[in-house]
Structures are given as structure tokens and as C-alpha cells.
Amino acid sequence: MVLDGDRVLVMKRHKRGRDYAVLPGGGVEPGETTAEAALRELHEETTLVAEIDRMLWTGRHNDRPATYFLMTAVRGQARLSGPEAAANRPDNSFELRWATADQFAELGLHPADIRGRLAQLLARSG
């Protein structure tokens, strides 16, 4: 998770006629730790480089285990990149944006069960 005061970086999606948002992230490759995967995915999807401050919590996303990390020492400017940029088209769009807690429901932040914990985290850091 990349925070900026009371905002978190999300990827707004439009796919198969559905609008929603997710946190940048993805799968763990063979031989990779979850922390290494989080840093790699962040860079691949956003061009940002960061360090991990700490693991925040674990859960499930799309029926797969998910580990959520708080990023620190974030460098660069968030720009869509990697497979998401290559696949970006009107019927399958990707857009990086900063979101406040009061925008989570409107954006359809997924998975929905992280909204409350993330809102608390933003309230403490904002």
C-alpha cells in the first residue's frame, strides 16, 4: 500500500462492463517471497520504487491468499506500466488514482473487507 497523507494509491478498473478499484499488486512468482512480490508488482504496475515498512494484514483476494504491506521511502511518480498499460483499452481499462476513505464505496474498492481497516490506517496517517 502506498499512502499519501489521507489517500491511498489504487488502480481503477473497468472490465466486462464492471467498474471497481484494487490496490496495486499481484501474484508471487516461484522463489519469491510475498514481500519481494509486493515490491516487484508495485514497480511493474506503477513505476514506483519503494521499501516495505511493515506487513499490515493478510486476507483473501479473488479466492487467493493476499498479504498487505505498507510501503515507505516511495520514489518516483505513479504511472501506469507493465501488462496493465499494454492491455489498457476502453473495454478493459486501468487508471491509477489516489483515493480517500470516503471514496472506497463509490470506487468499488475490492476486496470490500479491507475498506474499514484501510480507512483506519488512513485516519492515523493523514
Regions found by a protein language model. Give the residues of each.
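Hydrophobic pocket/interface hotspot
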Residues: M11, A38, L42, L96
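N-terminal strand-loop-strand
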Residues: M1-L23, A50-R54
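Active-site-adjacent beta-strand/loop module that shapes the phosphate/pyrophosphate-binding cleft
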Residues: R60-A86, R97-Q103, D113-S125
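A generic structural signal for short hydrophobic patches within well-formed alpha-helices
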Residues: V28, F104-A105
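Non-DNA-binding regulatory cores of transcription-related proteins
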Residues: N88-R89, S93-F94
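The catalytic Nudix box helix
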Residues: L23-M55
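Structured beta->alpha junctions
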Residues: K12, G27, W57-G59
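A short local loop/turn or secondary-structure capping micro-motif enriched for an aromatic residue
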Residues: G17-Y20, L39, N88, R115
